[in-house]
From Swiss-Prot:
Example GO biological process: photosynthesis
EC number(s) given by UniProt: 6.6.1.1
Locations listed in the record: Plastid, Chloroplast
Function: Involved in chlorophyll biosynthesis; introduces a magnesium ion into protoporphyrin IX to yield Mg-protoporphyrin IX.
Tree of life domain: Eukaryota
InterPro entries: CHLI-like, ChlI/MoxR_AAA_lid, Mg_chelatase_ATPase-isu, Mg_chelatse_chII-like_cat_dom, P-loop_NTPase
Protein name per the record: Magnesium-chelatase subunit ChlI
GO molecular function, one term: ATP binding
Pathway: Porphyrin-containing compound metabolism; chlorophyll biosynthesis
Keyword field: ATP-binding, Chlorophyll biosynthesis, Chloroplast, Ligase, Nucleotide-binding, Photosynthesis, Plastid
Top-tier EC class: ligase
Similarity field: Belongs to the Mg-chelatase subunits D/I family.
Gene: chlI
Xref: Pfam families: AAA_lid_2 (PF17863), Mg_chelatase (PF01078)
Length: 365
């Protein structure tokens, strides 16, 4: 199998080794919608990622980084910079496919699910990878230096302040996340590699909103607000202080809760294929999206997927009205047309139409 530049491999390994202990996910207080949206995307990555907007210092980055410890290790082909799956052809690089076809022995290793941060000043070459045209013309080989999309394959790609990122780069990220492949073309030379990841973006609305066309392509959207309750704020400060004082002992206190949630997620992933949505629920969801004047069908598709993931998370097989109610705002609010003359809150509008269609009023059940 093709050997890649060792300096690149060392770079990847060093970044992996430098990852510091993350604050435990189950120790986080508040921000329930953000945590739920992330978990549902882990259960079914086809939901399409999460975009969270909120005040500075509300824990957006902390929540995302704490998610990694809930994810199981993955099997990858050794010395392959694309995190190729040794079995699934859809998650293999071309080099691994060719090696398997030729009967070459494939060595595997287990790694932590990759979590890649995309820096704000990243160039397209840094994100997608670069082709050494000179070497390709002289040696006749496709000399490719993988980018961040290669590292993020089968993992999570996190973009903080995504609303400040160049629209062209956001388009590239969304295209790769949706299609599962990254294509790099230079001077008639083309490289294609798997790039299947959960895209998570965050930002501060005071610094500008994401364009509606791009926002619509994120599966779920969460508005995060600063926690106002004094007792909750004190509890957050105390937990952070205890974690900073001794991360090891703090993590040990949450080991059971972490393992419990991790098992719930793994079980939900396994049972997801068995969850069926009754036809009438599909009709009701479609009517909800139609009455809200949502453009396109992404809202319908994402809501159906998220409902199934939520049911699986709760160890059930049957969809209930309250399941749709719980997740609909996460899937639909960012797809609503903004009318500056309307005084009614958009999320309240969703609730009103939901009640009319589903005839469901016991929203606390």
């Amino acid at each position: 199998m093709k050997k890649y530049n060792k300096s690149f491999l060392i770079d990847v390994n060093c970044e992996t080794l430098k990852v510091r202990q993350a604050f435990p996910f189950t120790a986080l207080i508040g921000q329930t919608n953000m945590k739920l949206a992330l978990i549902l995307n882990v259960i079914d990555p086809k939901i399409g990622g999460v975009m969270s907007m909120g005040d500075r210092g509300t824990g957006k980055s902390t929540i995302v980084r704490s998610l990694v410890d809930l994810l199981p290790n993955i099997q990858v082909v050794s010395e392959d910079p694309f995190n190729s799956d040794p079995i699934d052809y859809d998650l293999m690089s071309q080099e691994v496919k060719e090696a398997k076809k030729s009967g070459e022995k494939i060595y595997t290793t287990s790694i932590k699910t990759p979590m890649v941060d995309l820096p704000l000043g990243a160039t397209e070459d840094r994100v997608c990878g670069t082709i050494d045209i000179e070497k390709a013309l002289i040696d006749g080989t496709k000399a490719f230096e993988p980018g961040l999309l290669a590292k993020a394959n089968r993992g999570i790609l996190y973009v903080d302040e995504v609303n400040l990122l160049d629209d062209h780069l956001v388009d590239i990220l969304l295209d790769s996340a949706a299609g599962g492949w990254n294509t790099v073309e230079r001077e008639g030379i083309s490289i294609v590699h798997p790039a299947r990841f959960i895209l998570i973006g965050s930002g501060n609305p005071e610094e500008g909103e994401l364009r509606p066309q791009l926002l619509d392509r994120f599966g779920m959207h969460v508005r995060i607000k600063t926690i106002k309750d004094p007792l909750s704020r004190v509890k957050i400060v105390e937990r952070r202080s205890n974690f900073d004082k001794s991360a090891e002992s703090f993590l040990k206190n949450y080991e059971y809760l972490q393992d419990f949630l991790k098992n719930r997620i793994v079980n939900a992933q396994g049972s997801l294929k068995d969850i069926k949505i009754d036809y009438q629920y599909k009709v009701n969801i479609a009517e909800l999206c139609s009455n809200l004047n949502i453009d396109g069908l992404r809202g319908d598709i994402v809501t159906n997927r998220a409902v199934k993931a939520f049911v699986a998370l709760n160890s059930r097989k049957t969809v209930l009205d309250k399941d749709v109610f719980t997740i609909m705002s996460l899937c639909l609010t960012h797809r609503l047309k903004k009318n500056p003359l309307e005084s009614i809150d958009s999320s309240q509008n969703i609730v009103t139409i939901f009640k009319d269609i589903f005839g469901y009023s016991d929203l606390t059940a």
